[in-house]
C-alpha cells in the first residue's frame, strides 16, 4: 500500500511539474494562450512531449531549450534577455532621456543668450554698479514660473 502512495505522490509531482512548464509555453496555433489552456492539436502534442521529456528524466531547462530549438524563441512566454531584447526595452528610455536633455539644454541656452545680449547692450556705457544692476534687472526678463502638465493643458484648452 505504501508503494502506491509513493507512486501516486510521484505521479502528482510529475504532473504538477508538467503543468508548470506548460503554463510557460505559448500555443503556436492560438498565440495568446498557453498550451495548458489551449485545446488545439499542437498544444495537446506539446503537452505530451513535455510529459515524455519529464518521464525521460530531463530538467526543466533542457525541456525549455528543446522547445525553443524546435519552435523558436516565441514559443516561450519569458524570452531570453539578450542584446536585441535590451535594445527593444531601452530605446524608449534613451529617446525620452535625450528629448528631456535637449529641452533642458534649449531652455538654458535661450536664457544664457538673453543674459549675453543684455550685457552687450550696456557694454561701454559708463554706469555705476547700482545703475548697472538696475538696467540688467530691466533688460533681463524674469524666469517664467514652473509650469506643470495640468497648467499647460488648461492654457491649451482655453485657446
Curated annotation (Swiss-Prot):
Organism: Arabidopsis thaliana (Mouse-ear cress)
Topological domain spans for side Mitochondrial intermembrane: 1-82
Protein family according to the UniProt entry: Belongs to the CcmH/CycL/Ccl2/NrfF family.
Function: Plays a central role in mitochondrial cytochrome c maturation. Probable component of a heme lyase complex involved in the reduction of apocytochrome c. Forms a complex with CCMF proteins (CCMFC, CCMFN1 and CCMFN2) that performs the assembly of heme with c-type apocytochromes in mitochondria.
Disruption phenotype: Embryonic lethality when homozygous. Arrest of embryo development at the torpedo stage.
Mitochondrial matrix side: 106-159
Quaternary state and interactors: Interacts (via N-terminus) with CYTC-1. Interacts with CCMFN1 and CCMFN2.
Transmembrane segments: 83-105
Keywords: Cytochrome c-type biogenesis, Heme, Iron, Membrane, Metal-binding, Mitochondrion, Mitochondrion inner membrane, Transmembrane, Transmembrane helix
GO biological process entries: cytochrome complex assembly; embryo development ending in seed dormancy
Location(s), subcellular: Mitochondrion inner membrane
UniProt gene name: CCMH
Protein name: Cytochrome c-type biogenesis CcmH-like mitochondrial protein
Metal-binding in keyword set: yes
GO terms for cellular component: mitochondrial inner membrane; mitochondrion; protein-containing complex
Bilayer topology annotation: Single-pass membrane protein
